């Protein structure tokens, strides 16, 4: 039995949390025991949404956040690792950026032999662009294994010897949960008051403007409406709706933008869409792009983002600097390109390494090395 301490997750479910959860739900729990380290107050818990998605026991340990009282927090972190490190064979540190190396440092200091850093993002936001490249120089001093969700993330996280050793671990999914279902599409559109013959564009993601660039979606949608008035923009996820509502009002499309809120069933909700639109400012290799393609959806994303192409109806030809009208035309041009051959979809996802059972076997093999 290998015992693994999982770090870097937050209490709610974002892309990173969902990736780790999917692996945990499929891992052989007779061979691997995972425990989770959360930052926050003593009563911090994973959200009900997280717990609902998790099918295995959740053992959670808590340490304080680094900020604003970093000195005191680091003392508590040191105490936790000093008292508990002997219980673990592996540290699995999941990170969107190399904002700090403390988990890896403490794991090494107190004798956790296998120390994995797993990169989930291919660019850093402005706040971390200074510290990430510095920590990139030293990550090899503390980690033993170097993983990334894709080639772009691998190059962003590692250089030199670490890059040569690094492995790509695909963000894998349970394909059957995402296969297109026309009956569910009809049902969902009725539920949200969308006419059956309406053109629906949208995305699944946390509403987080700095990264996800959702105001750009609204602006492009305002151009789509000029060309196809019978259209809707659907945001599936929770976050700052007020900001986007104001943008929608400014561009005159407030009555055509729908916020569904949080969902525990992404596969079902994807059926409501005709095109998946994802013009983020930065990403690693978003699992939602794999999920959207499993649903057969045409995907339109920006050309600076990592390439998650599996199906031929995946388009990343445009830049965020291109005009709103060009984006609108591109989205409308693929509106009828949903891939309905489910056998083909399943085969391509498996061949590209995104099928969860195969990916979990790879993960288990690496944990055992």
Residues of each region from the PLM?
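Short hydrophobic beta-strand element within catalytic cores of glycosyltransferases
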Residues: 298-302, 307
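Aromatic "clamp/platform" in nucleotide-sugar-dependent glycosyltransferases that forms part
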Residues: 262, 281
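Nucleotide-activated donor-binding/catalytic signature segment of Leloir-type glycosyltransferases, i.e.
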Residues: 245-261
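N-terminal strand-loop element at the rim of the active site
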Residues: 2, 6-14, 18-75, 239-241, ...
């Amino acid at each position: 039995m290998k015992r693994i301490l999982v770090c870097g997750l937050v209490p709610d479910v974002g892309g990173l949390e969902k990736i780790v959860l999917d692996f945990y739900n499929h891992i052989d729990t007779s061979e691997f025991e995972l425990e989770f380290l959360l930052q926050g107050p003593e009563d911090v818990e994973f959200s009900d949404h997280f717990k609902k998605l998790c099918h295995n026991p959740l053992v959670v340990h808590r340490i304080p956040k680094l900020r604003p009282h970093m000195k005191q927090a680091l003392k508590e972190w040191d105490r936790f690792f000093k008292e508990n490190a002997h219980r673990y064979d592996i540290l699995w540190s999941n990170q969107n950026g190399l904002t700090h190396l403390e988990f890896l440092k403490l794991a090494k200091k107190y004798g956790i032999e296998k120390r994995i850093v797993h990169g989930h993002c291919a660019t850093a936001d402005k706040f971390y662009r200074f510290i990430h490249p510095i920590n990139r120089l030293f990550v090899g001093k503390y980690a033993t294994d170097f993983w990334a969700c894709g080639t772009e993330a691998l190059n962003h996280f590692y250089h030199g010897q670490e890059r040569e050793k690094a492995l790509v671990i695909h963000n894998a999914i349970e394909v059957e949960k995402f296969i297109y279902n026309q009956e569910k599409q009809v049902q969902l559109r009725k539920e949200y008051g969308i006419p059956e013959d309406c053109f629906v564009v949208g995305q699944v993601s946390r509403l987080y403007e700095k990264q996800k660039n959702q105001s750009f979606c609204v602006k492009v949608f305002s151009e789509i409406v000029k060309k196809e008035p019978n259209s809707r923009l659907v945001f599936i996820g929770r976050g700052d709706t007020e900001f986007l509502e104001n943008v929608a009002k400014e561009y005159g499309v407030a009555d055509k933008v729908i916020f569904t809120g949080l969902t525990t069933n992404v596969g079902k909700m994807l059926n409501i869409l005709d095109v998946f639109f994802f013009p983020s400012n930065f990403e690693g290799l978003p699992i939602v792009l794999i999920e959207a393609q499993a649903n057969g959806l045409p995907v339109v994303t920006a050309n600076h983002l990592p390439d998650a192409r599996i199906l031929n109806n995946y388009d990343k030809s445009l830049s965020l600097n291109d005009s709103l009208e060009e984006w609108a035309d591109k989205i409308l041009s693929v509106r009828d390109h949903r891939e309905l051959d489910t056998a083909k979809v399943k085969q391509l996802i498996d061949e590209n390494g995104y099928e969860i059972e195969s990916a979990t076997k790879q993960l288990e093999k690496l944990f055992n090395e």
